[in-house]
Amino acid sequence: GCCSDPRCKHEC
């Protein structure tokens, strides 16, 4: 998921 991915974590 995005919240676990440093590349898009800022979207959470």
Curated annotation (Swiss-Prot):
Alpha-conotoxins act on postsynaptic membranes, they bind to the nicotinic acetylcholine receptors (nAChR) and thus inhibit them. The cysteine framework is I (CC-C-C). Alpha4/3 pattern. Expressed by the venom duct. It is found in: Secreted. This is Alpha-conotoxin-like Reg1d. Keywords: Acetylcholine receptor inhibiting toxin, Amidation, Disulfide bond, Ion channel impairing toxin, Neurotoxin, Postsynaptic neurotoxin, Secreted, Toxin. Belongs to the conotoxin A superfamily. The keyword Glycosyltransferase does not apply. The modification Cysteine amide is found at residue 12. GO terms for cellular component: extracellular region; host cell postsynaptic membrane. GO terms for molecular function: acetylcholine receptor inhibitor activity; ion channel regulator activity; toxin activity. It comes from the Eukaryota. Disulfide bonds join 2-8, 3-12.
